Amino acid sequence: MGNAADALGNADMLRLENLDTDIAPPKAAIEATLAAVTRDDANSYLPFLGIHSLRDAAAKRFTASTGIDCDPEAQCIVSAGGLSGVLNCLLAILEPGDEVIISDPAYAGLINRIRLAGGVPKFVPLLVVGGRWRLDLDALRDAASAKTRAILTMSPSMPSGIVHTAEEWAVIADVAERCDAWILHDAAMERILFTGAPVIHPASLPGMAERVITVGSVSKEYRMIGWRVGWIIGPKSIMNDIGLVSLTNVVCQVGIGMPGAAAALSAEQDGVAEATREWEARRDLILKELHDIPVVAPDGGWSLLIDTQTLGMSPGEASQKLFDKGAIAEAGENLPGKTH
């Protein structure tokens, strides 16, 4: 549908299929990026693993979320966006045929990168309980096997907006420990919460600090989609392998983007809390407008799902009807999981 909308060239169409935002990035990030454009050191292949100021800022951000000390030189490398970081991690930890547990539905970009790295996604469905998304914990336990190499988590997750509870995290940690598997955690939206509850980071759970690899990004919380800057933080035991993959896969990061990302992570006024309040208000408005339609309220993030089958039509049919009325929404049939 996005391609069809592009072909029409109608600027008045309401584009709901892509996760963009109109809330501006932090002012400090824009200023630092503009300054970097004129500097020789920002127009270089070096340093291959990312500038120190960004690695240091990302390490401090990780410590603030987890309470765990992080050595920026030994435990943090910069990636060309969050998804590039996820792929680098998967390439470092997977052998062909290894299984990666992931919730269903999940963002197609994550699922496809599991497959690109030679892994096999094992889908664990989300359930609707009390009007909210919940992880099927019995299915999670059943998905574990001798081939399980990793559990790929995201909270809030795309496209459902599920925010994992303490109980869900405890079971995820138990399964990871039982399978001797990594938890690969996409933390791109971890503070975009509408629940009022504190962030639960899996690395902060008992015994998980040496089992969790965290991928961060400035795209969502900091509204810096076009910068294509992320970072990876993990135990020293795996970071050398991830660094070698990064050097082979991407070589270097976005030189003029990294100073802006470092400024965003270090800014006293990063705008995340204000942006989250605005996103929550928009969510509430959408839920109010769609009160007669079966929408499961997201507890965080940038997206929500509508159960079109209760309206007597498939996701594709509903997407086409919206398109005909000038709105673009992604059909669940296009997601590579099993839940549509």
PLM segments and residue spans:
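PLP-dependent class I/II
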Residues: A7-L14, L19-A36, T63-H340
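Glycine-rich loop-to-alpha-helix module at the N-terminal edge of alpha/beta enzyme cores
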Residues: L16, R39-S44, A57-K60, A64
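Short beta-strand to alpha-helix junction loop
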Residues: L49-G50
